[in-house]
Amino acid sequence: GMHFFELAGPDLILGFDADPATRNVVGLIQADPELALKAVALRKFGQEIIRLVAGRRIHPTFAVPGGVNKSLKPEDRDTILKDIDEMIDITKLGLQIFKNWAEKNKEDIEKFAVFPTGYLGLTTPQNGLELYQGDIRLVGQDGRELEKFDASNYLDYIAEHVEDWSYLKFPYYKKMGYPQGVYRVGPLGRLNAVDHIDTPLANEEFMRYRSMNDGKPIENTLHYHYARLIETLFAIERTRVLLDDADILRKDILNTRHDFKNEGVGVIEAPRGTLFHHYIANESGLIEKVNLIVSTGHNNWSMSKAVDSVAKTYIHGQEINEGLLNRVEAAIRAHDPCLSCSTHAIGQMPMVVEIKDMQGNLINTLKRG
């Protein structure tokens, strides 16, 4: 919710070419104060869940080895439940805003960083959307399943390519090699990797989403925003399902057995995509080896491709302007990497765009930040 309203909202609601002095969250508040308040309410709802479940909003210490350190109180459960209908309405409003924008900007959507890849995400046994447990499902460019595997075996399926121009590695599907085996994660990746969603409102919207390309994967980078809102709807509906389960109030929250296991692999879906955490420790509990593949890494190839595609689509001749730079930035921001928080919060992402002729001679440069 925060990403759509506060980070992507300035582009979609105010426009890619709006004055950068107002194309930010402050400008959004000035343009539509009521919408801004609803966006803040959705953000607050998520933060309150963290506080009530984990004890505090910032750096909670909820998860501990063997379980969690706090059970949920009945009154806290009821506090969360009472706001769910309002949060669903706010998310539906966001969906309507996006669809209205998409209707008016079809040309941009169809040419803004549209390219095929594979898609990867956690799924239920029936290939439904999952965020916390299940198997990893990888589908190809045509949407057909390539693999479905337990995350602990990720190294059998995923390798990482190195380019001399990037500090970040490029994960890919081993059997297809690089770059044929690259894939996307996050909202677009997850919704392309599943067949349905197990909550009614989100699944209804998901069916509309998938129908845009006759059931085949959605390749349009700007539809990351659409997928993100559908997932927000799912998360809110799923929250209600969990809170309505009596087991949510159980007090047995910690497994006190101490069977030593020196190696573990964890996987989870963060908002921006799939996280693999792989740890090896000695008998004293000291971590000796770590391997992480985080969502910004999974999406490294697609973000690079998106920047290249947007620049080639929107640069004509030698002229480049601030609106172009913002589109390049928006291509990165749609994937929601860790650096997206800085792109609207404090103003502008430092950026240099160079235009070269066919012989490689530099003919124009635009810098900012």
What are these regions (language model features)?
Residues G1-R272, S284, V294-G369:
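Active-site bordering "gate/hinge" segments
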